[in-house]
Amino acid sequence: MSELKKMKIRLLKLHPNAVIPAYQSAGAAGFDLCCVESLEIPPLGRALVSTGLALALEEGYELQIRPRSGLALKHGITVLNTPGTVDSDYRGEIKVILINLGAESFSIQAGDRIAQGVVSRLSIAELCEVESLDETARGAGGFGSTGKS
């Protein structure tokens, strides 16, 4: 397997309870983000959860904030705006919007892993207005138009 490019991300702890993110396995795509304070999210409730961290990404990259699959499966906890995007020029605190889709309140303790961050290279689109678009077999069909499942 080829060597993956490693990028240094400068982190600033904004809160004494902030946890420096870590990858949990050699093949993990994302590193875990932890919360700095305890809170409870009621069923169908949402919360803006602080990580106590700010960071600086290299230009041309973004940080995607994604749900942790175990929290989603076991408790119905997910990232509301998944994937959340942290731009390379943002320097404020990284916060995560969590929603509880489960039937019971969910308690989070300071230091709990609440989401994962995935660094992704950007492609910047050049948007060009045109008079018409090329025809395709699919056409304008959407929202289930290509099959049952």
UniProtKB/Swiss-Prot annotation:
Family recorded in the similarity comment: Belongs to the dUTPase family.
Q: Which gene encodes it?
A: dut
Catalytic activity reported:
dUTP + H2O = dUMP + diphosphate + H(+)
Q: In which pathway does it act?
A: Pyrimidine metabolism; dUMP biosynthesis; dUMP from dCTP (dUTP route): step 2/2
Cofactor(s) required for function per UniProt: Mg(2+)
Top class in the EC scheme: hydrolase
Which HAMAP family does UniProt cross-reference here? dUTPase_bact (MF_00116)
List this protein's GO terms for biological process: dUMP biosynthetic process; dUTP catabolic process
Q: Which residues bind substrate?
A: 68-70, 81, 85-87, 95
Q: Which CDD domains match?
A: trimeric_dUTPase (cd07557)
Pfam family, any one: dUTPase
What keyword terms does UniProt attach to this protein?
Hydrolase, Magnesium, Metal-binding, Nucleotide metabolism
Question: Which GO-annotated molecular functions does the record name?
Answer: dUTP diphosphatase activity; magnesium ion binding
- Free-text function comment from the UniProt entry: This enzyme is involved in nucleotide metabolism: it produces dUMP, the immediate precursor of thymidine nucleotides and it decreases the intracellular concentration of dUTP so that uracil cannot be incorporated into DNA.
Keyword check for Ribonucleoprotein, yes or no: no
- The entry's protein name is Deoxyuridine 5'-triphosphate nucleotidohydrolase
EC number(s) from the headed UniProt entry: 3.6.1.23
